Curated annotation (Swiss-Prot):
Species in which this protein is naturally found: Hyperthermus butylicus (strain DSM 5456 / JCM 9403 / PLM1-5)
Subunit structure: Homomer.
Matches recorded under NCBIfam families: folE, PRK09347.1-2, PRK09347.1-3
Protein name: GTP cyclohydrolase 1
Keyword Mitochondrion: no
Gene symbol of the encoding locus: folE
UniProt: Zn(2+) binding residues: C73, H76, C144
GO molecular function terms listed in the Swiss-Prot or TrEMBL record: GTP binding; GTP cyclohydrolase I activity; zinc ion binding
Classification of source organism: Archaea, Thermoproteota, Thermoprotei, Desulfurococcales, Pyrodictiaceae
Length: 193
């Protein structure tokens, strides 16, 4: 989806004027262009195309944990950010680990809500691996909630649990044990930014 940067720049100028600012003053003169460039970068997930290469024949649990992501809330255009944890049981094929990170980026770098993003990641992991046994957990802080409204930055946790992970409680618990060191509260403590 190509972004119309000229329209974004015009809209940002109008917003600046609407709040009583002078878009030509020092410090704001380049803001419309910077905002357009920012949206182009933050929304690059719409242009994601990926071919998947399968590697080894495997059946053991695969977990990629603590994948950092940034997204934009579609309701307020404010960031939400956090970590994603992806687990799946291969059905004879394993995709490259970097592909899992790219899938998270594909769906986080869009106007989003966390619930839909988590489901989309799980769907794509299932499609890419050919496995119905997928578990995706996302943990995020939403600035639309932290900076406005209730003004509370409590993390939101969303899980998409499919296949064996739904049926086998011990398997689900194993994933939670594996991801524990990479949970959002620990990542933030280690400096997310």
């Amino acid at each position: 989806m190509p972004i119309d940067k000229a329209k974004i720049e015009k809209a940002v100028r109008m917003i600046l004027e609407a709040i009583g600012e002078d878009p030509e003053r020092e410090g704001l003169r380049e803001t419309p262009r910077r905002v357009a460039d920012m949206f182009e970068e933050l929304l690059e997930g719409y242009d994601f195309t990926e071919e998947y290469t399968w590697f080894t024949e495997a059946t053991d649990l695969v977990v990629v944990s603590g994948i950092r992501f940034y997204s934009l809330c579609e309701h307020h255009l404010l960031p939400f950010f956090g970590v994603a944890h992806v687990a799946y049981l291969p059905r004879g094929k394993v995709i490259g680990l970097s592909k899992i990170v790219r899938i998270v980026n594909k769906y986080s770098r869009r106007l989003q809500i966390q619930e839909r993003m988590t489901k989309q990641i799980a769907d794509e992991i299932s499609k890419a691996t050919g496995s119905p046994d997928v578990m995706v957990i996302t943990e995020a802080v939403h600035l639309c909630m932290a900076m406005r409204g209730v003004r509370n930055g409590a993390p939101t946790v969303v899980a998409a649990v499919r296949g064996e992970f739904e049926r086998d409680q011990s398997l689900k618990e194993e994933v939670y044990r594996i991801i524990e060191p990479h949970r959002l509260s620990r990542v933030i403590a280690l400096s997310f930014f």
